[in-house]
């Protein structure tokens, strides 16, 4: 006999008991990256929560998965601080960047890792050069030189892969003619090297250049500009087997695929959708060439990803019917199969192998079982809503969902507005335990793709230029008002939460509007001038486009800094910060906390030792999630069902609790 359905318990929103604990959220926080095919196998990196979030290299072949690097080998590069493309597999040998010292290590099958580059240099995005007669194979890598920390240099270098005595040196410089360089890609005949460059103050989603140069024993000869410029973002160069160079450009207003030719660049299957994402990390791959005149491309439309098979000569495409809403790290297995990291609405991220002919996907590795039963998962609902000055903005709305509970009649749920980082990142509808943590407890969530987000074209992405702290705040406020106006949220119990650039938006919104009644700032910016002065090279001129260049725009920096709007803070603030954050240093959080304390604004502050830009340790993830839940419970007057550690909110009188 089937079980009889139980009658849902009536309980206040926010107080519902959820099977998704903070501990389960931390244990299931596995992320996959740098997926690539090599040597007839798939390789990727994933963080291991049981080892404090340490990142290990794994491979899959012959139906089995194996860990390649030993425990303790933390495979992460800090080039640009955000890293990516931290390893390369060559036959029975892998080379990887070790987080602790940023040196390249050589690991032969069955052997012990040994460093092959000196300290004070960082490496990423390495490719293999073909072995010439009687000579060793070599690597070409992006190198970041930190021998003089005040003048960091980014170059392309050549390293010998067979390193007598274990020492490669720092590498032979091939190209040093730009502030930044990425995507070194070798032509099939081994004679030409394509690569992407850009200079301050541009970010790679603003303007880059695709260059090609002849590669000789003496180095690179006279790089030639193929595409790009200060107002065109070119990414992901790839050579086809016939020697054709393909790349992605946003010259049409959307990142689309192009083929280089004698008559100029030719668009391939042009559409008003995005075929790429901002280059925050090395090694991003949003299309693969199959070697038979076809490519598999990933494109994003209204924030939802799809895959299509494209005929490169005819310019036609066929979408694949797959049960996923997010794809990344596309890689070729063979002419009939590709692999990707895929996310779905009701299952956690997986590495999947896709049969192109049938459209069938086979799971290679999963981040774990779904944290909730299917009927307990809140599905993302895309919403478009009016914002300031006639703009239309976008978001994903998640309704409170727990079959064991229903809200008290006549009440509406609290609403948590999430603000992604970047600020050019993108909210995705794929299942995230961090969202379901709230919805399964009776708290509605809106994940906002404010103006400046990627996934909606260049114009939408540039809507934040000169307007950071304005457009993003307007759009998040508009999302909340839209949901309150459609009776999906309690206007008196609205909160805002974000990290990094999203944390800055949180602070501005709290200091300049009365829409929110609580806010959580995770390592956000409080002083714009200090950010421009103190941050790392990659982002050191980012704010030039978002606000303006210094010193000309000093008055705007001052007006956009939350530290200069302290009188506007009226509601409780929770601040969470990593003590070792090189992107947004801890003094950004400490200064705003000290200022709020001095003005008796209710504030709670937690500084996490050993954490950087984004939390990785399970104990930190657990504590920060529990603290945020306790914070909203105190402010909004509901009692969470969880057993939570005490949280001190300085300046919040008990009498203020509802």
Model feature map: region roles:
Residues 448-658:
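Active-site-proximal cap/loop segments of hydrolase catalytic domains
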Residues 10-60, 74-88:
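Beta-strand-rich domains and repeat architectures in extracellular enzymes and scaffolds
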Residues 61-63, 108-111, 160-166, 215-218, ...:
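Short loop/turn segments that connect beta-strands within beta-propeller blades
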Residues 31-34, 45-46, 54-55, 66-67, ...:
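Non-catalytic accessory segments flanking enzyme active sites
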Residues 19-26, 66-77, 112-117, 170-175, ...:
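A short beta-strand motif characteristic of beta-propeller blades
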Residues 27-38, 74-94, 120-138, 176-194, ...:
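Conserved beta-propeller blade repeats
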Residues 46-56, 75-81, 96-104, 118-123, ...:
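A flexible loop/linker signature enriched in serine peptidases of the S9 family
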Residues 147, 201, 367-492, 499, ...:
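Cap/lid segment of the alpha/beta-hydrolase catalytic domain
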């Amino acid at each position: 006999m089937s079980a009889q359905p139980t009658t849902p318990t009536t309980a206040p929103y926010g107080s519902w008991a959820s099977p998704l604990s903070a501990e389960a959220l931390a244990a299931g926080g596995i992320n996959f990256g740098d997926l690539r095919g090599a040597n007839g196998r798939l390789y990727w990196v994933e963080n291991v929560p049981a080892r404090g979030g340490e990142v290990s290299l794994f491979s899959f072949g012959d139906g089995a998965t194996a860990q390649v690097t030993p425990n303790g080998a933390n495979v992460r590069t800090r080039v640009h601080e955000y890293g990516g493309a931290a390893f390369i597999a060559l036959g029975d040998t892998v080379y990887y960047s070790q987080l602790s010292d940023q040196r390249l290590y050589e690991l032969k099958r069955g052997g012990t890792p040994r460093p092959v580059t000196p300290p004070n240099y960082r490496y990423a995005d390495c490719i293999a050069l073909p072995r010439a007669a009687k000579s060793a194979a070599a690597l070409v890598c992006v190198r970041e030189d930190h021998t003089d920390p005040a003048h960091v240099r980014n170059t392309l270098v050549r390293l010998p892969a067979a390193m007598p005595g274990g020492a490669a040196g720092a590498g032979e410089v091939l190209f040093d003619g730009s502030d930044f360089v990425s995507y070194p890609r070798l032509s099939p005949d081994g004679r030409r090297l394509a690569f992407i460059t850009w200079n301050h103050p541009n970010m790679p989603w603003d303007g880059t250049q695709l260059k090609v140069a002849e590669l000789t024993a003496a180095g690179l000869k006279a790089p030639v500009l193929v595409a790009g410029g200060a107002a065109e973002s070119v990414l992901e160069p790839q050579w086809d087997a016939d020697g054709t160079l393909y790349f992605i450009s946003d010259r049409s207003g959307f990142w689309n695929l192009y083929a280089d030719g004698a008559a100029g660049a030719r668009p391939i299957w042009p559409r008003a959708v995005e075929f790429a994402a901002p280059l925050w990390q090395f090694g991003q791959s949003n299309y693969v060439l199959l070697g038979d005149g076809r490519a598999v491309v990933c494109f994003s439309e209204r924030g939802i990803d799809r895959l299509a098979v494209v005929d490169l000569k005819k310019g036609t495409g066929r979408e694949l019917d797959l049960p996923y809403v997010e794809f990344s790290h596309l890689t070729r297995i063979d002419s009939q199969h590709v692999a990707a990291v895929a996310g779905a609405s009701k299952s956690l991220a997986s590495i999947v192998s896709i049969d192109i002919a049938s459209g069938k996907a086979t799971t290679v590795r999963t981040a774990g079982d779904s944290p909730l039963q299917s009927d307990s998962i809140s599905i993302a609902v895309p919403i478009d809503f009016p914002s300031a000055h006639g703009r239309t903005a976008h978001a994903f709305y998640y309704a409170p969902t727990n079959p064991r509970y229903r809200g008290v009649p006549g009440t509406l749920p609290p609403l948590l507005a999430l603000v992604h980082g970047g600020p050019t990142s993108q909210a995705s509808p794929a299942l995230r335990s961090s969202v379901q943590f709230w919805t399964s407890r009776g708290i509605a969530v809106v994940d906002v793709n404010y103006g400046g987000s990627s996934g909606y074209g260049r114009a939408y992405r540039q809507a934040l230029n000169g307007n950071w702290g304005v457009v993003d705040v307007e759009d998040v406020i508009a999302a909340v008002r839209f949901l309150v106006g459609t009776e999906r949220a309690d206007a008196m119990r609205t909160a805002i939460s974000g990290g990094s650039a999203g944390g800055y938006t949180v602070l501005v919104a709290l200091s300049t509007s009365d829409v929110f009644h609580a806010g959580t700032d995770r390592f956000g910016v409080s002083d714009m001038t200090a950010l421009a002065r103190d941050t790392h090279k990659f982002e050191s001129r980012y704010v030039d486009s978002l606000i303006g260049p210094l010193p000309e725009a000093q008055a705007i920096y001052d007006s956009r800094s939350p530290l200069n709007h302290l009188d506007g803070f009226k509601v409780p603030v929770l601040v969470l910060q990593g003590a070792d954050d090189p992107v947004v240093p801890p003094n950004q959080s400490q200064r705003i906390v000290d200022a709020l304390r001095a003005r008796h604004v209710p504030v709670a502050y937690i500084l996490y030792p050993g954490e950087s830009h984004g939390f990785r340790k399970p104990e930190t993830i657990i504590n920060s999630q529990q603290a945020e839940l306790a914070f909203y419970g105190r402010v909004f007057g509901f009692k969470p069902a969880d057993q939570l550690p005490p949280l001190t909110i300085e300046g919040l009188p008990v009498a203020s609790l509802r």
